Structures are given as C-alpha cells and as structure tokens.
C-alpha cells in the first residue's frame, strides 16, 4: 500500500488500483490521460451529481489533456437518478447514444455516481463492443466501500436486482472523500451500514474504532455546509481511516477470490436476509439500512445455532444503533419511511432462495463465531426451519420429550443491577469495567440515553465480555428527545438523571418519550417529588405518564424530598442514586404507606456503597434515608450478578419436567429478592433445592407431582410470581379436593409492562385453567398437566418478557405445540431465551406467523365485549340488543346493573346523593364490567359516562387494549324529539338543556370511541329490519367476518356502481334497479353537497348521515371515496387533513372498502393504513395530467410499489386517446401479474377507453340506465359490458333447465329470462320434463349446459349424476340446483340446495333478520321441513319446535339434526299442555304442509295456542311463512294473521330460491324488489 499527503492506494488483484483520499480530480484526470489513452472519454453520471461535479471534472480532464498535448473528445451522459435507471432500456439507451457518437473500442468510460451508476455503466463497459476500459468514480460512501470495488457490474430485471451482469474489473477506483460533503446524511449513514458490516465480519480492531466514534462522526455528518470549509475537516483522518479499513478488507478478499468461489461471499454478511428485506422495502428503505437489519438477524441466527456468544449480538446491535441505523423492521425509522409495508416470513424465505451463495436448494448464510471472525471461510448452510425461527414474529414451543435430565444454565446479567451499574458508573469519576452486563433492549436504551446526555462514553474489551464506562457525572442538554421504547426502568431512573442537567447558554430542554405502552405506564409520584424539589417538568400528553419535558435549571435542589413509593420501588432508587449530586444533602422520606419491593431499595443502597457513597437509614423515622452530598468513585472492576428473576425460568423448567437444573452464579448471598424463589416457592411445591451462597440447584418431582401452595406472599420477589403462576396451573398433588394456589403481595404487578395479574388470568383460561384476581394477588386452580388444553389462538404476551417466558414453561407440558406471540418481547431481559430452550433444554421450536396477532388484553376483536356510549335517546339499548343478537353475546344495560347493585333507581340516587356520587358509582360499575366481562358481552353505558375523566381514561385504555367502544350517533333533532316525550330520566344537573349537554359531551364521545355507528334516518318501511341490516354490515367488517371481497375478486367479472348524487336521499328510489349485477356501491363523498357547509366540502357529520342512509337502503358493500380535484374529483387538495379526517371517520363507521389516492402525502397514507383494520383499501391513481403511458409504463410502475404496499386492490386510471391505448393497457395488465398478486382495476377514461372497461374483470366501476347521469366519461352499465363480452365471445351462450315432472305451470323460465334480460347474459332457460331421471343424462353432458334447477320427484334421484355436493346439500340430503364447475381443467357437476336460502331471504326481507334467543316453529315433517329447520338454525333460533300429525315422522326428522339445533318435537295429543305452549312465543313459523290437506283438530288447536301470545310492541318482527301458495292466502295464514303475524306465502320463497340459483350460476345478483312485482303479477294471473 502506498500513500502521499492526500491519497492512499490499496492493492487489488496485484495492482495499485484503488485510491482513497481528498481532492482527487487532478489525479483522476492525469491517470486517464497517462494510463488510459483514448480518442474519447465518456462520463456517465446522474442529475443529482451533475450540477455539483460534472463541469469540474470535464474542465479538469480538458486541462490534463492540454498538459499532455492530446485532444480527446470528452462526452457526457446524464441520466435520471435511482434504481429505476438500472435497467435494460437505460443500458440500451446509453449504448445507442455511444454508437451515435461514433465511440469505438478505445473509448474509456467514467462511472461517476453511486452504486446505480457504477453497476449500470460498468455493465455497459463490459459489453460495449465486447468490452471497453472504464474507471469507477464513486460519489457515495456505500459505493466507495462496496459496489465500486471488485468488478461486479449488473442491471435489474422485473424478477430481481442484479440478475443480469458481468465481472468486469475497472482500471482504477478513485474514492474522493470530498464527494461525501454533498451526500445527504441519510445516504452517508446508509454507507456506514456496509462499513460496520465489513469490520464486524473481518476485523475486530476496525470494529472497535467504529464503536468508539459514532458521536463525532454523526456530528460531522449533520453539520451544515459552509462555503469554503470542508465539513469533515475535524474528522479528516478518522474518516479516511474507517473508509480505508473497509476498502482494504474488500480488496483483500477480492484478490483472494475474484469470482466468488467461496471466500468472497463472506462480504455478504448481513446480505442474505438483508437482501430479502430490501426486495420488499426498497426504495423507501436503503441498501445499507436493510443490510443493518440483515446483520442483526444473521447474528441472532448465529447465536440461535449456538455458535456466537450473546454479547456479540448486543455489541454489534448497539454499534448499528449508535449510527442511527435500523436494527429491526419495527424500528421507528422503518415505520417512518415504509411502515405500511409488510415483510411476511414466507416471502422473505422465498426471496432468499434466489441467492448466488446458495448450493442448489440449500440456503447459505454468513455465520459469525465472534466479532471480526466468521464461523467458516465461506457462507454456512442453514435450514429454512432455523431461519424461520429467527425471522418469525411468533414462536411455536413443542412439549418436553425427556431429551435432557441435568442442565447447567447461566442467565444473563440482572437487568436491575445492569441498569443501576450503568447509572452509577456514568456518574462516577474514573473508568469502570462492567462484566456480565445484560445485553438487551433496555440496557441499550439506557446506554444510548446516557451517551446523548453526555454522561459517559462506552467501549468494549475482551471480545465484548467487558463494558468499559468512562463517566464523570457531567450532563448536557441532548440534541434530540430521548426515546426509551418500553424500558420502564430506564424511564424512571433517567427522569431524575435528566433533572441533574444544568442550565446552559444554548438553552434547550430534555424530552423523555417512549412507545405506546410506555406512554400509559405511571411515573406521576416521581414527577411530583421532583417538581416539589424545584424541577421544571411537564407532561406532553397523558397526565402521569411519558412523554415528559424538563427545562434544565440548577439541577436537583436537595434537602427533604417526600416520595410516594407504594407503586414502584424504582422511584426510590432513581432519587437515591442521583441524590449525591444535589445542591445539598438529601433526606428522602417515603410516604403513603409501606413501600413496595424493599429488597430492590436495599440493592440500590448496597450498590451505591460499592461506588463510594454511604446511605444512612434513619433510626428514628420509618422509611427515611439520609444521602450525603458526594461524588461516586469507580470501583474499577464490577461484576454484575445474573438476573434472579430470569433464573426462575430454568429452575421452573426442572420443576415442571422432573429434571435437574443448576444456576451457577446466584445463591443465598444474592442482593436480589428473587433469589429466594427456589427456597420459598419451589421447595414447598415438592422440589429438592440445594443452595450455596453463589449457586442454586433444583431437582423437580416426577411430572405431575407438583404441590399447590395454599398461600404464598411474594412481595419480596414480585416479578417471579408469573413463573410461580405457570407452575401452579399444574400443581395438583395435594390431599384436599381443591388444588388452589394463592399468591399475594404482588399488587405492583398491575402497573408493569402490562397488568400482569389480569394477563395471567386471561391467558391461563386458554389452557383450560381457572384463575382469578385477588386484591393484591392471584389464585390458580391447579389441574393435571394431562388435562391441559393447547391454546388454539396462541398466547398473547402483552409486550411483556416475563409473560412470554413464564408461559414458555407451561407449554412444555401441553398436549401439542403451543404458539407464543411476539417472541421478541424477551429481549428486555433475556434476548436469547429461545436459544437456551433449543440448545440447553433441547426443546423443538418453530417460527410461525399468526394470521392475525391478537390485540392486547385478551381478545380478538370478534369476541371482544362491545361498550356502547352516546347521548341518552341515541338508541343504545335498541342497538345493543341487535348487536348481542347478531354476535350471540349477552346484553347488559349498565344503568340497570347499577340500580340492581344499589337497589334503587337512578333518579332516586341522584336526588338523595347527588350527581357526583352517582358518577362514582357509575364509574365503579364500568370498571367491574371491563375487569370481569371483557369478552362476549354488549354493554350500554349511560349517556353521561364520559363526564367523568377516570371513565374516559378507562374507555380509552379499553380501546387501546383491543376492546370495542362504539359511539352511537343519532340526528340531534331526532334525539331532542324523542326525549321531549320520555319523562323516565332524571333532569340534567343544573337543568342544563339537552342540546348544550350534547355539545359539551360530543368531543368526549369522539375521544373515547374506537368506532362510530350512525343510526340511519328511516322514514318508512321496516325500521327494525333496516337497522339490523345496517348493523349486520357494520359488524361483519369490524369483527373481520366479511367475505364478500374474497368472493368478488375470484369471480370472472365483478362490478361496483358509482353514485354521484349530491344527496343520497335522492338516489334511494333508483337503487333497486341500478344495483343489478353489482357487487358493491361507491359513495363519492367529495360530490356530496352539505347545505350547511361554507368550506366547499361536506362536514363529517353530514357525510356520516349520508353514509348511514345508504347502508340502510342496500345490503351491498360500500366503497367510500374522497376524490381530490387533482385526481378528477371535487375535494380541494389543499385540504388534505380534512380529507384524511373523512377517511378515518369512514374506517370508524366500518366501511367495507376505502378508496385511497396515492397523491396524498405518505404521512396521510400511513395514518389511514395504520387504522384500516378489516376495511379493504383500493389504492388509486388517476392520470388526469396524462403523464403516464401504458406502452412505456415506467411511471405506472413507480406508483405500483406504493400502491401494492398500501392497497388490497390497485386501481390505475388512464385516458385513452386512441384504441391502441386500450391494447397497451391490456399488455400492461398481463405483465402486472409478474409484479404482484394484488388484484388490478385498470381502465381508460373517455369514450375511446370504453373497451378497457370491458376488458377489466375486477370491480369495474359502472353506471346504470336507471341513473340520471354517469359518474365518469365513458362509463358503461353492467348490461353493456356483459353484452360486449358476449359479442366478443368472452361469455359463451349457455342453456339452463328445470328438471322435474309435472312442471308445465312453472314460472321459473319467466324469472330467469327476466334476469338474463336485465344483465345482458346470452343464456336461455327452458323446462325439461321427463318421466325418468335418466332423461337428463344427455343434457348434463352437453358443452353448453350452464346449470339446472331440480324439483320433485328428482331431488334425490339426481345425486347419481353429480360429482360432489355442497355442505348444505349433503346435510339436507336433497339437491335443487346443479352447477357445472371447472377444477384443474376438468368439468364437474356440483349439487346445491337453495331451498333453505329462499326461506332465510324471505324472513330477512320481512324484518326477521335474527332469531337469536327466540323460538321457531316448523309445521310438517316432509322433505321441505329439513330445509326449514336448517334455515331457522341459520337465522339463530334458540329452540326449533317441530309439529307434525304423525309423531314418528317428526322424530325421524329430528334425528337428522345435531343436538345444538335444539329441535324439539311437540306431541299434539297432549292437549293438557296447551297452556304451556302459549308461553313459547314463536317468532318465526314455517308451514311445510299442503294447504289443501286439512289438519287434525288436535294439531290445529296446538298451532292456535302457539301463535296466540306474541308481544304487541314487536308484532312486525313475528313472521309466518306458508310454503304453500295455492291459494295465495292459506287457512294457516289466516290463523296467523289473526294473531298479528306478518304472513308470507310460498311464492316469495320460490322467487328467492330461484334468484339464489341465478347468483350461483352467474355470480351476478338481481335485487328481489326489482323482479318481484312482475313475477307476482304473472303468478296472480295464473291462479285467477
């Protein structure tokens, strides 16, 4: 290696060909003229670099040529920046241009730019005229240390990056570090990812240099440029040194292995996994950032395989974090730039399969065995199973299989001691060397914060075994807010540390913040104590929690400090450790009762003594401590004891499996209270415990022999209660009948990472273990491990390391493997716990990704209890009952529950005790409901529940933890009208008007709710039915049970109707005809005209009522669209925040689909995507500016990345100027599948573009001739599109039939021909009457056979010709619909049954949407009775009574159905029981007996009795259906009508089941209302 003042050369492949230095332009140009003589030099660069450097280099090259007396041509080519330029077309464009410039084989190409320019221009050089000379002039740090060195050149293809290229060595590489001055900070840091990678993989000495200098390097990187000054001047030598180290390594490796025979792929450390992430996250996330994440994952893989020590993972991770590189896809940096993108493990592994390092199907990854040293001299073969464990969000733990009997496990260093030691060492004078430090998220957060505060610097010795802390007790105002994630210990300790920051000339503030969970954890008592001591601290969000803002003053004043310490001992330790640096000695008084966790306070005092400060406990005052004013002195070396709380898990492993385990460095002399766990908990449970001062050994009893603990106080080891709870679940070896363990003294565990007591109770239930909360503890009913259930939905861990590890112990004895969700939560205290399970305990693990990770406390949304809030009179009780019925939950009115509890009425309570007392009682009832009934209930709150701040906080917390708080909104005028006639409620306090109360509470309702349900204004018709229909759609979306989307995208053609009315009420009358054939309806919110708006766009309230009106009018999904002006709509682009507000509101309304324009800001897109839950998103882009071309779709493809990331469906809309535009679009549609599997809506606007609408097959926007105007130019109707497809041959003519005899009078042909005419289908429907079922055989085999209905007598006989049956047809044992289907290219005939569907639809249309909790009656026991019973069960009937003249036949029908159908046969011969039957109140009745056959008198009497008693106020919901229709009004209908039933004859069922068959055959829906009138007129003519 040679060097001069400004440049250092590094040899590669036997030549001095890589030069690293400053101001190299003259050297570069002289090199070209002297060593690369040519008639033409071609400089290729991009538009980012050209303005800064191109003229400078062309001038320098011209001057060099003059100096040498030559006159070559100097040509320049400037191309667009970015990865999209690294493609075949750009390469061809440059080559064609070079040919046009008469470039020959002596041409020399100069690649001046980043990796894209170097790779692409290098590949041009490799292939132009079979290879020309070139040099690399890298302008980014990443290119300098990576892509420019080694001769790799390539371009990207649609299938992946760098898949086409060549090895072509440059003549030279010039890394001119002056280029870095104009490099954006993020791009510089991106390059640091590669620098760190090289050092971590190859040279620990280089890595140490990087570890020691992040602050000074980042300060220079972020320093603003000043003309005439080099921004890196103060780190000039350091910068060159770290870049040289990386360059030197790469040159050395390339020299040894130019063509990647094995050694060179070591340079791909971090890339196997990093490239997989990059394939998904690029371009939002940069290469070096992805490699950073990949490094961490590959380090974790090395550790998981038992090759790399845990501290090495922590060390490299901290180094990456110190340079602000992301270390996880969950980092804030990733969320900021690409938070909307998902990285499914299956996809990552699939991408990893395409890696040049692989050996066939075997994946190879660079595995490290130490920092600076690889496991092998080439990438190591690793199984997909092991990779999946590291990459997966969740982990599956298999039961113990007796593979080990005696194990020694050393837990990581104590989190409590590690964090205290970091604080004390940072404040101490001198250098402290810490060993056995815990490497975890918590300690990394603490170290990063202390560095940012200027308190200490950190470095590593002994290959990462020793942390060297250079402290001194001086603090400065940090340059940014201190993000503490979910590190509660760090938050509490650093709050007081931050108070020591003194005033400075620059001013500033200290902000402590954290993640969502951290922002609800308490810190109020500590803040109160510090405020009282003169500290300026304010809450930035929630009172009593982070984030905090602290204004530096004169530090801690000192003197007497009073602190409430009954919640957390960490408050005490925080003040104790900082007290010596107060302005005067401190007397710390703990007030409010007995302090919690005294042993942790004692630990802190003992550690302070080790650093030279003695705390004196008062002998005269309880819980009082005297701390002198002093400075800490470093003890030099300080060994951190292993974490005693963590030690409980391996010891519990021994206890539950009957094996032996030793923890060698925790014993009876430990400072930690949890060290008593073995002696005080495991021994009484039946374990043999041996404990020395420094070690603990546990031998468990035989499996199943653990003893329950009647009562154990765990106040001195509260964190260990979770481990004890897991063991107690299978502790049943006792003499008594009850195997109950009671654990007390752990109240503080309710305010840890989560409410741990509630969490354990909830998750134990998944194992079938009964448990419950005590005032300060938990009780657990132990049972045999053989009786445990395997939790089907997995164990939710609440982002709590101890919950995860405790349940990992219990899963060892479950029947089958158990999934533990969010495995990464253990990084807080034992990052490699899963590795220990695998390597030490030989437990089989598997990485899994749950389809939908359960949300907090508990519950998937589908079973979460629903809490209703809203004004009195909004309809909470009515809607609550509907929700309970539809979700099969129980309904509670919390006002009524309060009255029961206090044995009084609310008006009396208010009159006697006042509103304040009432509100407190109301709050208590709500708290009890959430604590005890968080699933399977619906609760209506009183309208004023939001008046109480604590209640609002409770509701908000419930939402954050996964519960549903539904705000019921009703038009204010309607509420006022209703309340004016309702006198049963107490007057508001101070006789306040209802309107004022509404206005005051309205924002509180909005603050507390997770969703909104706007009650529709229904002027006429069946109000209850429409309300139930609206609620049904809402609930299907909110609970994730909606399946329409999946069905719609699988159909050959699907459509949605575009509504463009200024007021939806004007559209209602058009809808029955307009929605024919449609799968959804689009509500264009931007076109609504709010009469009260002065802004030019409608208010949220107005749109809400319009949305509710539409949802009540149709039973179709709604697509909600706010189209901006730039995209062809009316909503002002300048009012983006208001547009986002509307879209977020639509999500809360449970809208089925949201159209999300890609033109909104990334922040808006992310905000909406983050809250989408079960709503589907169409990401749309309308090329109204006509900048995109289907023929050259680069612009479309640039949109595609973001469209697929945010959307479930992509919608691209162009403008057709010629018919060719439509054909180009189809070519794009075909190629689209190579980019993504997301559905595509792609159309052209305008009349010329109509053909594109015909070709589009997924959710094509349509109009209808029934509407007064179209929504967009060129829009077609469903009928027009289907007609066009038919004319083109895309839809072939088909023939449909009715099989049966006699069928001459059937009206089925009329029905189906009407439907064909309405939709444009080229189909026919005919009667096929045959005396034998054999007659249909030839028809079934015809190629144009489209389907058939089957009636008597062939519903059973037809089965012999069918290949398969639907589940319903198989269950009912009869077929009335034959459907030809294609499966793997083979035609099959499928039998279905729509009889039951016809019955269900008839009841729904009549208003009986849901029979939950109600009784039903079926009369008759023939074939149709089965369909009727099936339909009643589908509608949710509680009991289904069956009445038939012949009891034995009724019993036969009953025997067909499972027990859960609750079919009960009525014995009509027992006339003495008639009085009992009148009490049944059957809400739904289906008669299946012929109308012309008189019933026995005993049967008639029973029917009359059964129908006689129905609630007068609910008569419209009681429906009688007679399957007979000759005559139209049957005798039984007359009886039912007399008693108040809504009566329907069988003609409607025939129509409904026929429409159901039509939908099955065609995929198109025709609304019943549109064909009903015509059908009934024709049928009436026939009967009359």
UniProtKB/Swiss-Prot annotation:
Alphabetized InterPro entries for the sequence: Aldolase_TIM, Aminoacid_DH-like_N_sf, DHQ_synth_AroB, DHQS/DOIS_N, DHQS_C, DHquinase_I, Enolpyruvate_Tfrase_dom, Enolpyruvate_Tfrase_sf
Binding site for Zn(2+): 194, 271, 287
Pathway(s) of this molecule: Metabolic intermediate biosynthesis; chorismate biosynthesis; chorismate from D-erythrose 4-phosphate and phosphoenolpyruvate: step 2/7; Metabolic intermediate biosynthesis; chorismate biosynthesis; chorismate from D-erythrose 4-phosphate and phosphoenolpyruvate: step 3/7; Metabolic intermediate biosynthesis; chorismate biosynthesis; chorismate from D-erythrose 4-phosphate and phosphoenolpyruvate: step 4/7; Metabolic intermediate biosynthesis; chorismate biosynthesis; chorismate from D-erythrose 4-phosphate and phosphoenolpyruvate: step 5/7
Location of region: Shikimate kinase: 863-1058
Function: The AROM polypeptide catalyzes 5 consecutive enzymatic reactions in prechorismate polyaromatic amino acid biosynthesis.
Any single GO BP term: chorismate biosynthetic process
Active-site residues, as the UniProt record annotates them: 260 (proton acceptor), 275 (proton acceptor), 825 (for epsp synthase activity), 1182 (proton acceptor), 1211 (schiff-base intermediate with substrate)
Cited Pfam families: DHQ_synthase, DHQS_C, DHquinase_I, EPSP_synthase, SDH_C, Shikimate_DH, Shikimate_dh_N, SKI
Region (Shikimate dehydrogenase) location: 1293-1584
Binding site for ATP: 870-877
Necessary cofactors: Zn(2+)
Residues passing through the membrane, by range: none
Annotated keywords: Amino-acid biosynthesis, Aromatic amino acid biosynthesis, ATP-binding, Cytoplasm, Kinase, Lyase, Metal-binding, Multifunctional enzyme, NADP, Nucleotide-binding, Oxidoreductase, Transferase, Zinc
Cofactor detail note: Binds 2 Zn(2+) ions per subunit.
Name of the protein described by the UniProt record: Pentafunctional AROM polypeptide
Record keyword Protein biosynthesis present: no
Source organism: Schizosaccharomyces japonicus (strain yFS275 / FY16936) (Fission yeast)
Region entry EPSP synthase, spans: 397-843
Residues at which 7-phospho-2-dehydro-3-deoxy-D-arabino-heptonate binds: 130, 146, 152, 162, 194-197, 250, 264-268, 271, 287, 356
Homology family: In the N-terminal section; belongs to the sugar phosphate cyclases superfamily. Dehydroquinate synthase family. In the 2nd section; belongs to the EPSP synthase family.
Biological classification of the source: Eukaryota, Fungi, Dikarya, Ascomycota, Taphrinomycotina
